[in-house]
UniProtKB/Swiss-Prot annotation:
Stated role: Catalyzes the transfer of a ribosyl phosphate group from 5-phosphoribose 1-diphosphate to orotate, leading to the formation of orotidine monophosphate (OMP).
Protein known as: Orotate phosphoribosyltransferase
PROSITE patterns reported in the protein's UniProt record: PUR_PYR_PR_TRANSFER
SUPFAM superfamilies: PRTase-like
The organism of origin for this protein: Hypocrea jecorina (Trichoderma reesei)
């Protein structure tokens, strides 16, 4: 990737890995919202050992930065089913590798879509959430539904949710209830921050992607992505 980007080295490395691995693609993609996006991010493609190490490393650096700058403290890394499951385990291992003095005792947990009624039972797998500070990790926040479900499950256990870290913040406003996308509006991340009062961090934002694109992408892809940001950027 060219050196014109102002992104920190680990963000540049993550962005390049996402593009080279087919995780981040440019073109024309219809989203669940029916919007036509010029880019698409699918963290499920981080399935090779090399790419899994890259995403775990980028998450770990983002989390440690959040600890240093925002005082983020946690005992458990929680991954909502399904994409959050491999993320939480890989991230926990990486945190123990890069900061063993502080994070070697961090555990991970994830949820089942349906509660198990035999064996150990319940819908939480991994470390018990009882009395623990919980950090949620996932790929993106689109409508926020999965994160609300995770927060409610954690709260139901009577535990402390301390924050959320995602791979990508699309910085995109939620679809308007009346279908009029010309109206300004908040993002799903902004609404979650407001509703639950918890910090949310991202490895990359759409602004980061556009900054990084200038080192390698075609002028058409850059313009399409900038136009999409201008049309759908959230107010928060």
């Amino acid at each position: 990737m060219a050196t014109t980007s102002q992104l920190p080295a680990y963000k540049q490395d993550f962005l390049k890995s996402a593009i080279d691995g087919g995780v981040l693609k440019f073109g024309s993609f219809e989203l669940k919202s029916k919007r036509i996006s010029p880019y698409f991010f699918n963290a499920g493609e981080f399935h090779t050992a090399r790419l899994a190490r890259r995403i775990a490393s980028a998450f770990a650096k983002t989390i440690i930065e959040a600890q240093e700058k925002a005082g983020l403290e946690f005992d458990i890394v929680f991954g909502p089913a399904y994409k959050g499951i491999p993320l939480c385990s890989a991230i926990t291992i990486k945190l123990g590798d890069v900061a063993p003095q502080n994070l070697d005792r961090v555990s991970y947990s994830f949820d089942r879509k349906e509660a198990k009624d035999h064996g150990e039972g319940g819908n939480i797998v991994g470390a018990s959430l009882k009395g623990k500070r919980v950090l949620i990790v996932d790929d993106v926040i689109t409508a926020g539904t999965a994160k609300r479900d995770a927060i409610e499950k954690i709260t139901k256990e009577g535990r402390h949710r301390r924050g959320i870290v995602v791979a990508l913040d699309r910085m995109e406003k939620l679809p308007a209830a009346d279908g009029d996308d010309s109206k300004p509006g908040p993002s799903a991340i902004g609404e979650l921050r407001k509703e639950y009062g918890i910090p949310i961090f991202a490895i990359l934002t759409l602004d980061d992607i556009i900054d990084g694109m200038k080192g390698f992408a075609t002028p058409e892809d850059i313009k399409n992505t900038e136009d999409y940001r201008a049309k759908y950027k959230a107010t928060d």
